[in-house]
Amino acid sequence: MAAGGAEGGSGPGAAMGDCAEIKSQFRTREGFYKLLPGDGAARRSGPASAQTPVPPQPPQPPPGPASASGPGAAGPASSPPPAGPGPGPALPAVRLSLVRLGEPDSAGAGEPPATPAGLGSGGDRVCFNLGRELYFYPGCCRRGSQRSIDLNKPIDKRIYKGTQPTCHDFNQFTAATETISLLVGFSAGQVQYLDLIKKDTSKLFNEERLIDKTKVTYLKWLPESESLFLASHASGHLYLYNVSHPCASAPPQYSLLKQGEGFSVYAAKSKAPRNPLAKWAVGEGPLNEFAFSPDGRHLACVSQDGCLRVFHFDSMLLRGLMKSYFGGLLCVCWSPDGRYVVTGGEDDLVTVWSFTEGRVVARGHGHKSWVNAVAFDPYTTRAEEAATAAGADGERSGEEEEEEPEAAGTGSAGGAPLSPLPKAGSITYRFGSAGQDTQFCLWDLTEDVLYPHPPLARTRTLPGTPGTTPPAASSSRGGEPGPGPLPRSLSRSNSLPHPAGGGKAGGPGVAAEPGTPFSIGRFATLTLQERRDRGAEKEHKRYHSLGNISRGGSGGSGSGGEKPSGPVPRSRLDPAKVLGTALCPRIHEVPLLEPLVCKKIAQERLTVLLFLEDCIITACQEGLICTWARPGKAFTDEETEAQTGEGSWPRSPSKSVVEGISSQPGNSPSGTVV
């Protein structure tokens, strides 16, 4: 489907009047995604609330040790929260975290609990920040679109003074009705650990700002860990914490543990267990976001220097590197099977990078401003032969999927999510992106883009042809048959040697295995060889010399031979030199994707994108949360009215204005003042 191929026929290139209209539904091959009629009032009040003047606030103390105090009184509950950007310092981006606690609330459509004790009941819990405030709500149940997030009835509310919450994350591994662990990062550098059930459980890390004085840009619990988490800062540092250990009373001392191209890893010098346990210095400038692979073994980081770096977390080795086309990278996510990484950033593009091949496989152009959020949709990402091969769960055969293409691909329509791929076949990855241009885009990454058959089949003679099997299938997998979960030892046997360099990898930088030399040069040879296979002789001659840039001390002539053979603490990637190599291919050297859907869905920049089984959740900077029902999951007007009444949950997907929160002081107890 062409860009913007939804109802109304408008797209990115339509008239200004059409582009200004906020969409309430969009269509894909599986049907219509709808924002139901119950959201009309909230939608009409959205722009008005964004223009409501914010009452003058009392002066706040500057962030620092003096403002990091214990529990205290909250600010006035009657003043509306800030809506949208305004004069003065920019507000932190609105973030949303969701945790699932097993079975949904037994109350069904009954009134949700209005006290903090209600956090212990089943269902989902949602946390999001707005300005200096942090809100907690009962979220969507497992039938995601059949319950809305009622922003007028918060379970808990916390107001912070002197600093602002910038990010947060629930511990899904330990989440239960008796404990909900949450991490909150702040603009002054502190990190708070709290339990929403056990009110006496609360800790503040980096309280005196001795570890790092810059804002916390992102934090995440380690997969399947009860106590370990990572926190990244605007300084470009990534810290490993243990909630069971205290912080040192003096600035921590570190010893160099490992070093490579563009990164360094330090261990804390301390006889007693103290936080932080380790520090990573990654890239140049702020470390904007990071994400663990589905198997929890690899860590993908994106920085303001425009680099995507993928590390093997346990061995702290650099496994992959990619450079943005322009500017910094702001967001990152993994595909459900761990084969691909998608990034978005200041080049207005979404970039798909293959972890198994170490190269950019596609770029997507549909946004007109920075891309703030990217996410794969595991419920429409599918392998069409998986159902036939597995023969489980009563899924339809491949012939039935071909007969009913519009019904395939949704979580409720018999699609086969990739987690991981049981068998190689016709693969379609679905992912989405949300940008500062208020546009929401959906993208399909299909097999013809991932494995282009005709050009490669004519000249490629080495094993591991991408046109026949996925790249991981031809890699040495230590005896593991077929493409399954990414193993700890991922071989690069499908990498092609450079015709001039003989495939030698000199220079430190990227390592495939401990003790095995691996350099960025192999990334460059991949793209150069594929350009030759496509018959692009002109491009090959034009950029042939650039293939030696990243080969370090491999003996090649040109600027590559001038790089030092030893590791460097920070990245020295020159954008002018890497452009045209595998680290950063030119626009015409990789497929350019068109969005399946590209719609304006908000008045302010979008900051949140979550894919759930029955719905999609988006949020924008003015504090509006939208729930989009998947095809076949939306109620009619009569059903919505029948299930929405006085004192009951509105059971249709809705978008609510945070301005209504302040009218519920009884439901908004204050928390820790930082």
UniProtKB/Swiss-Prot annotation:
* Modified residues annotated as N-acetylalanine in this record: A2
Query: Per UniProt, what does mutating W370A do?
Result: Impairs binding to USP12
Q: Where is the composition biased (Low complexity)?
A: 66-77, 107-118, 457-478, 487-499
Question: Where, subcellularly, is it found?
Answer: Cytoplasm; Nucleus; Perikaryon; Cell projection, Dendrite
* Positions where Phosphoserine occurs in the chain: S495
For the keyword RNA-binding, the answer is no
Residues bearing Omega-N-methylarginine? R551
* UniProt protein name: Dystrophia myotonica WD repeat-containing protein
Native source species: Homo sapiens (Human)
Q: One GO CC annotation, please? A: cytoplasm
